[in-house]
């Protein structure tokens, strides 16, 4: 479905595709997830894919879950709260979108669901991904995996 998402990577990718096509190399720009991050004061905010309302408008039957987790192993110094909101489709089980906010670890974590969206992964498959663990960077169950496993219960 057509959309307008004014992000630098998408503009660059579109420019390269236009140049390639002009030079006779047929290139098609693949779909986008609208992945974006920003920081406001101490909070990192990130999104990729569809929100619940966007999913409904696109004809999906969305289910969603919101979880609160820690950015690092709970006993590790400096662990901060992260809130994850994940959206999936009840009919297909497909992951549709993820939104996150927290003081650390959000901007880099959003990359995993962005790749999952590009690959059109299901929520169950995403919940089985092997995300890295080390106490200074993540709890054993990464907040994204916790969200996916909770969302599976609603699909």
What are the functions of these language-model segments?
Residues 44, 48, 57-155:
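Flexible, glycine-rich terminal cap/loop adjacent to redox cofactors
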